[in-house]
Regions:
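Conserved SAM/SAH cofactor-binding pocket of Class I
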Residues: 3-104
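Acidic-residue sensor for enzyme active/binding pockets
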Residues: 5, 110, 114, 149
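S-adenosylmethionine
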Residues: 89-90, 109, 167
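Conserved Class I SAM-dependent methyltransferase catalytic core
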Residues: 123-187
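Short, well-ordered coil/turn elements that cap or connect secondary structure elements
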Residues: 18, 41, 67-69, 114, ...
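Mobile active-site "lid"/loop adjacent to the S-adenosyl-L-methionine
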Residues: 98-128
C-alpha cells in the first residue's frame, strides 16, 4: 500500500548499502515489507513472523516471486513470543493491527475484506505498540532500528510511549504521500 511505501522506502535508503543485516518483520501478513526490504538490500537476511499460517503461505509466494527465499525464514508465531533469546536483529519492522475494536464495523469495503486479526488493535488501537515498546529492544542490537506503521492520529501517543520506555533514541515520524504521519522510526540506545 502507498501508506507503507513511503516509510519503507526511507528505511531502505538508510540501509541499502549495509552488509550482513539481519531484520525481522512482526505481523508480516503478505510479507510485503520484509520482501521489499530484502529485495533492495541484497545482502540482508530476514525473519517474517505471523500468527496466521495462511498469511505466511502468501508471504512465502511473494518471496519466491522476488527470488529472496534463500535469505528469509517464515515463522508461525504470536508476535514477539515467536522469538527466542538468541534472536537478535539489526532492525525490526511492524505494521501491526491499529484500528480500535469499536471502529472495525465502519471500515471502507477495500479494508473490510482483510481478516479481523489483521485489523483489530484492541480497545484503543495501540495494543501491539505497548508490546513493542516493552519487548522489542531485547531483540535488537545496540543501535538497531525499529520501524512501525500506525493509524491516522496515533503518532503522538505512540511516539510518547516509545520515548517513555527509555530504550530508544533518534526518533523520526515519517509522513505518507498525503502528508499524514504514518510511521515511527527509532533506534535502540
Amino acid at each position: 500500500r502507498p501508506d507503507t511505501e513511503t516509510w519503507l522506502e526511507k528505511v531502505i535508503q538508510y540501509y541499502r548499502n549495509e552488509t550482513g543485516l539481519k531484520v525481522a518483520d512482526l505481523g508480516t501478513g503478505s510479507g510485503a515489507i520484509l520482501v521489499g526490504f530484502l529485495y533492495y538490500c541484497r545482502d540482508a537476511v530476514g525473519v517474517g513472523v505471523d500468527i496466521s499460517t495462511e498469511a505466511l503461505k502468501i508471504a512465502e509466494e511473494n518471496g519466491q516471486n522476488l527470488k529472496i527465499t534463500d535469505r528469509v525464514e517464515w515463522r508461525q508465531g504470536d508476535y514477539l513470543k515467536a522469538f527466542d533469546e538468541e534472536d537478535i536483529f539489526d532492525g525490526i519492522f511492524s505494521n501491526p493491527p491499529y484500528i480500535p475494536t469499536k471502529d472495525i464495523g465502519g471500515l471502507p469495503g477495500e479494508v473490510k475484506h482483510e481478516p479481523r486479526l489483521a485489523l483489530d488493535g484492541g480497545t484503543d488501537g495501540i495494543y501491539f505498540y505497548h508490546l513493542l515498546a516493552k519487548g522489542a529492544a531485547e531483540h535488537l542490537k545496540p543501535g538497531g532500528f525499529l520501524a512501525v506503521e500506525f493509524g491516522i492520529g496515533q503518532a503522538t501517543d505512540i511516539l510518547e510511549m516509545f520515548r517513555k520506555s527509555a530504550q530508544y533514541e533518534d526518533f523520526e515520524v515519517i509522513k505518507d504521500y498525503g502528508g499524514i504521519e504514518r510511521a515511527l522510526y527509532c533506534r535502540k540506545k
